């Protein structure tokens, strides 16, 4: 489950799901990604998710992180940011699904190159889901999206 601008919507849906036997990992972005230095998730929400058996993981943005810090100061784009923009051609949620899958892979929370379902959304709740076999960020191009389960129409 990915972060979005309105995490409460996705997290409320999660509370309604029967997820016994399914590992759910909430992957969030580190401070500063959206221009503010507060945590993206409140302590209360994190505790609620953990009480539901959800693993909560916060890390640097896999498809920008330090590279965006350089490009915002020095100008231009680095290759990782270009790859992120290319993924957005398919859909913002697809880009986020790829990104959070790699972040979870980097942390050892999912098996490398084994299929998982990644769910993401940007701004309006979870609206995109893919089956992906994630690679770690150091092997970004080895990640494979096997299926797009759902995504909103691009407008």
Model-predicted segments: where are they?
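Conserved mixed alpha/beta catalytic, RNA-binding, or beta-rich assembly cores of soluble enzyme
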Residues: 1-155
């Amino acid at each position: 489950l990915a972060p979005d601008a309105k995490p409460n919507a996705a997290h409320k849906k999660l509370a309604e799901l029967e997820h016994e036997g399914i590992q759910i990992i909430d992957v969030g972005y580190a401070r500063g990604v959206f221009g503010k230095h507060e945590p993206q998730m409140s302590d209360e929400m994190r505790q609620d998710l953990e009480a539901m058996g959800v693993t909560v993981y916060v890390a640097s943005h896999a498809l920008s992180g330090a590279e965006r810090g350089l490009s915002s100061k020095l100008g231009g784009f680095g290759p990782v940011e270009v790859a992120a923009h290319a993924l957005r051609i398919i859909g913002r949620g697809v880009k986020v699904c790829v990104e959070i899958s790699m972040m979870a892979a980097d942390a050892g929370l999912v098996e490398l190159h084994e299929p998982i379902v990644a769910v993401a959304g940007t701004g309006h709740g979870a609206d995109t889901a893919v089956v992906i076999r994630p690679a770690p960020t150091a092997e970004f191009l080895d990640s494979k999206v096997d299926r797009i389960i759902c995504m909103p129409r691009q407008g």
